Amino acid sequence: MAREKFERNKPHVNIGTIGHVDHGKTTLTAAITNVLAKKGQAQAQDYGDIDGAPEERERGITINTAHVEYETEGRHYAHVDCPGHADYVKNMITGAAQMDGAILVCAATDGPMAQTKEHILLAKQVGVPALVVALNKCDMVDDEEIIELVEMEIRELLDSYDFPGDDIPIVQVSGLKALEGDSNWESKIEELMKAVDASIPEPEREIDKPFLMAIEDVFSITGRGTVATGRIERGKVKVGEEVEIVGIRDTRLTTVTGVEMFRKLLDEGMAGDNVGLLLRGVQKEDIERGMVLVKKGSITPHTKFEGEVYVLKKEEGGRHTPFFAGYRPQFYIRTTDVTGQITAFTSDDGANVEMVMPGDRIKMTGELICPVAIEQGMRFAIREGGRTIGAGVVSKIIE
């Protein structure tokens, strides 16, 4: 019974394939499932299964993404693969597919190309912590020297984007040959997965991080006090614990005197729970949607940040016209809209950009009118009159 084995409790890791168009990301993904299927650790999928990915909507943006799952000896993986370059950009920026690590696929026949660079930069900007390189199509290159040169070029490129180029494993593979059942190339896929197991760190579980809950609603209950409701994003909170209310106004301290879920009282709430927290000494008018409750001292509010942004095309429901530095949209952060100004745009090479068109990916500097609990790696939407016109991720906190 292979089915039982599949449900063993292994640590779960989210990964994906990234890299230039036609370098073989989807073929490699199919090859991984086929090689692991022979050990009963995956369901074999062919190129067509993965390439015909259904459309999904994430924050009002349509993205095509294929999801496959498989196991290695020590882990369970969820793996995302996107058919088009624009899908990758949207996926990584919206965090629709949060990646704990990625397999960078680069063809030995071409070496690193424009999107290879762009995906490495994006991985850095959105906080993908680790990469493993699959040097694909190695069956088509006879000259060992060419392969060595391409490897050197990839390592230098990784270094230039602050990834540890010397330490990242580069495994020579052929997705196509492995799919065809060539045992030499199948063993290379196994080698690749061993490198992924070893080099992509296990993500810290949300429950082990410091407590944070974004406030969605506030009620006042006669005789009991004020209750803030929301979904606990990370960590846990116990009755009697001190927490801080952060964002929009000055940070203040309060004590959680009750945790309630589905009208039942709990001793503690934890990551993923939708709860109501009863707060001591707080009036209903003191707190509002958009503030967060956090473990004391774990987070400070900010107003100025850099972000990597994808601007929606007209067909995606975005703007029809370009905008310029000085543009004042709403930033939808966690649970609320905050007005802000985009003070500057810069391109990948650091040059200032005057005008941004629908469909562009751009780096921006934003300034909010009031301090909010923003953090590096956090996702946000840019909205105008209630409709989403862009999606972004905080790449750096300025102040």
From Swiss-Prot:
It comes from the Bacteria. It catalyses: GTP + H2O = GDP + phosphate + H(+). It holds the Pfam family GTP_EFTU. Residues 136-139 are annotated as: G4. GTP hydrolase that promotes the GTP-dependent binding of aminoacyl-tRNA to the A-site of ribosomes during protein biosynthesis. NCBIfam families: EF-Tu, PRK00049.1, PRK12735.1, PRK12736.1, small_GTP. This is Elongation factor Tu.
